[in-house]
Every structure is written in C-alpha cells, then in structure tokens.
C-alpha cells in the first residue's frame, strides 16, 4: 500500500492524503458473504445515545470475516482477491477453498492474489496460515489471536497490528502486544502468522471534517463549551474549567476508568506502557 498526497487546490485538500489502493484486486464484495448493516447512530434499542460522536456516514454492507478457521483444518485455500472493507482499517482476503467454500479473512502483509494458505497444527509458518500457539515457534510475528480456545480472534486485527510470541511456558504462551503489554494466552488458542497489512493507514491525513463525516464520525464538543442544560460542565460567566472532576453528559465520572480487578488481568505479565490518565 502507498499513500497519495493531494496538491493544495482547496483548503480541504491542503495536506490531505488518501490510500492508493494498489493492492485491491476487486471493487465489489462476494455477495454470499455480505449482510445488511443498518445505521444505529450510536443509539441502543430504546433510542438513548450510548456512544457519542456517531451518526451519518456512507451506507455500508457488513463483510462476514472468518475469525476461527478451525473447521477448515487441512483444507488448502487460494487467495482469490484482496478487497477493501469499509468496516475496518485492514484489507480483507477472499479465500476459495478446494472444497468450494468461500471465506473472508484479515489480509496479512505480503499476502498476494494467487497465494495458497491453510489452517491446522501442521500448517507451514508463512503469512496467512492459521495454527495453535503451541505449534508456532518463539519469536514469530502473528496477528488475529484468540483469547480463549475456539473463541475466535480478538487481538491484533487492525491495520499494521503485529503481536510477537516471546515465550512458551507450560500451558501458556507469552505474547507481546502492540501496546507493549506482555500477556499469557493458552497455547491451544489459535493465531495467524504475519502482521496485518495496510500499515500506512495511520499516516493518512484526512484533511477536512467532511471526510470524517463520510465515515460516520460526528464532532466532539467539549462539555465546558455547552450550556448547563446540555452538560454538567456547561455554563458559567466567561470561560470556566467546569468546576468539578471530569464527567460525561450524564454526570458519571470519566477519566481513568479501567477496571483494576478484571478477571483476565491475572494473565498480564507486564502492563502496557503508562502515561497520563492510563493504567
């Protein structure tokens, strides 16, 4: 993937850039692997806003991604297409299995149209192959890692993400995550070899607010800039600091909200790098 920069023909174009999509081989998705994706606008079933700054955006179809692949152990698949997916930053690869099945997977770096991939304990260590952690050599870069055996890939799914297998001790494998955290994961959990492609995604300059609106992202307005009816931090004469600890529009305290007693925290060997308002 490369990035194409625009000339400053308008204020919105100045400094903006876009992916060149050179790796994309097909512009329309496989019809059997898409589902409708109704807009929710960040609201739940009662109409209450549960996620702010969401709404609008271009119409999308959801691509069904195979995050497990355990039911295709030992079945070879050919990479038929590399496609764009509007629902994630990574590209997706359309696999044609020799038994006639078609599936989408996250497209790792260096996976090209026409390559062959497989899943299973005896698969080779090459990009796109899916194996249990116990069968992957220490030091290998992986992505799409399960947290629980058979639970489907949960970690390392976004563009450019890579996880390194740093050690194996007993029934656990130690993984170094992109955040710097080192975590124990059951060796029966599966992962895909290689790093996720489209790593240049993070270098794209969106250029104008309108491009974010196309993605369904609405403006983020500070509470202190609102009226008292709209936010607990609103109002006051002149500019104010809010006068209280940071809260959300409902009055619930915000900031450092990570649970210190989450059940899975006992599997963390070394916590992620910390900074202001992080744990």
Swiss-Prot record:
GO biological process: cytoplasmic translation
Transmembrane segments: none
UniProt biased composition (Basic residues): 50-59, 269-279
Secretion signal, residue range per the UniProt entry: none
Disulfide feature: none
Disordered: annotated span: 1-59, 224-279
Record bears the keyword Iron: no
Gene Ontology MF annotations: rRNA binding; structural constituent of ribosome; transferase activity
GO cellular component terms attached to this protein's record: large ribosomal subunit
Subunit organization: Part of the 50S ribosomal subunit. Forms a bridge to the 30S subunit in the 70S ribosome.
NCBIfam families, per the entry: rplB_bact (TIGR01171)
Family: Belongs to the universal ribosomal protein uL2 family.
Biological role stated in the UniProt entry: One of the primary rRNA binding proteins. Required for association of the 30S and 50S subunits to form the 70S ribosome, for tRNA binding and peptide bond formation. It has been suggested to have peptidyltransferase activity; this is somewhat controversial. Makes several contacts with the 16S rRNA in the 70S ribosome.
Protein name: Large ribosomal subunit protein uL2
Organism: Arthrobacter sp. (strain FB24)
Lineage: Bacteria, Bacillati, Actinomycetota, Actinomycetes, Micrococcales
Gene name of this polypeptide: rplB
